[in-house]
Amino acid sequence: PGLVVDCYNDILVTQISNTGMEQHKQMIYDILLEVFKENGHIIQAIYERNDIKVREKEGLTSYKGFYYNPNNISPQTIINENGIQLQVDIENGQKTGYFLDQKSNRVLLRNIARNKRVLDCFSHTGGFALNAAYGNAKAVTAVDVSNVALQQGYQNAKLNHLEDKIQFVQADVFDYLEQLKDNEFDI
């Protein structure tokens, strides 16, 4: 690997974890901008999330910030994922801002959640909880230790008019699981 590239609307977010990619990032970024342009997608900014510990093993410094941002756009954006609006904080969110690699799993949950009681552990900003609620789950509980993540999840629920369908719980997930009754949740 060594390179992660996620696209949020017109912002590319990159994460470089090895020296080889770091040495060639200008060429990589130029190619990315050109490929997106050729496909009709004009990129307005490139944000680097090179604030991961693995870079230290390669002797690389840890940093994050805009590499390219001629229009001075914000590191926060709203994306649409399969009909659900999500606020993404590219600057402070986990990984590159959101877990795009879980997109198909969130849709799978949406498709099986109808009339089920769903528990979303380590809910982050609520992607799975939102999809369960959108899929007409009977009840949805989102648990995370981070109050900031839960607040973002609640804002995402409001953005989609689902705030009354999801209960947000700030707790250590392992402690929370210990206190559950048998069969309290279906999923």
Which stretches of residues belong to each language-model region?
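Rossmann-like S-adenosyl-L-methionine
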Residues: 71-187
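Non-catalytic substrate-recognition/targeting regions of SAM-dependent transferases
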Residues: 4-6, 26-98
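Conserved catalytic micro-motifs used in adenylation/nucleotidyl-transfer and phosphoryl/amide-
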Residues: 1-25
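Short glycine-rich loop/turn motifs that provide flexible caps or phosphate-binding loops at active sites
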Residues: 1, 9, 58, 125-126, ...
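Anionic group-transfer/hydrolysis microenvironments
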Residues: 8, 17, 50-51, 91, ...
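Glycine-rich nucleotide phosphate-binding loop and flanking beta-alpha elements
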Residues: 20, 54, 125
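Short, charged, low-complexity patches
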Residues: 21-25, 29, 102, 106
